């Protein structure tokens, strides 16, 4: 008989590779606050990969920064973001993504009047690898 895993087990499964696969969502993932009233949920968090769902209210922005080791991929679920990477600005709409190589100075902002939801996929995880820029 197959093992039935409850969604409540998702937080533990998001942090280990030995746990069986379980559904994970914002409802059962580890949550944190960042920037201008923004939210993040760790959907996957291990030593090799992180997948975070993030929420940015209208007008919010993060601090320009870079990661020495982590490459990142931002995939927009709803709304659109303005991504600045090495001084170049790109509007990224829902259903699209943008790759940020390691070492690239970048900043994501929500210039619209609508909230934005997006995924940030980092390999390796970017925690502890962030260097904020003087702006």
Regions inferred by a protein language model and the residue ranges of each:
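A short, N-terminal "cap"/entry segment at the start of jelly-roll beta-barrel domains
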Residues: 1-49, 63, 129-135
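Conserved short histidine dyad/triad with adjacent acidic residue
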Residues: 35, 52-67
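Short strand-connecting beta-turns/loops that link adjacent beta-strands
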Residues: 47-49, 69, 113-114
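Glycine- and acidic-residue-biased ligand/ion/polar-headgroup-sensing regions
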Residues: 69-71, 75-81, 86
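Structural motif
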Residues: 80-82, 89, 105, 115
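Short acidic-glycine-tyrosine-enriched beta hairpin
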Residues: 87-102
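Ligand-binding loop in jelly-roll beta-barrel domains
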Residues: 102-128
């Amino acid at each position: 008989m197959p093992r039935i895993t409850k969604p409540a087990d998702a937080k533990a499964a998001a942090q280990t590779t030995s746990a069986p696969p379980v559904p994970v969502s914002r409802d059962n993932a580890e949550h944190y606050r960042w920037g201008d009233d923004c939210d993040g949920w760790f959907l996957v968090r291990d030593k090799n990969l992180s997948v975070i769902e993030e929420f940015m209210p209208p007008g919010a922005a993060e601090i320009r920064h870079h990661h020495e080791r982590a490459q990142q991929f931002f995939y927009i679920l709803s709304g659109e973001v303005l991504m600045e990477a090495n001084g170049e600005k790109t509007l990224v709409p829902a259903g699209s993504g943008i790759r940020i190589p390691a070492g690239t100075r970048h900043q994501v902002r929500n210039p619209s009047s609508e909230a934005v939801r997006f995924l940030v996929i980092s390999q390796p995880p970017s925690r502890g690898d962030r260097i904020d820029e003087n702006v």
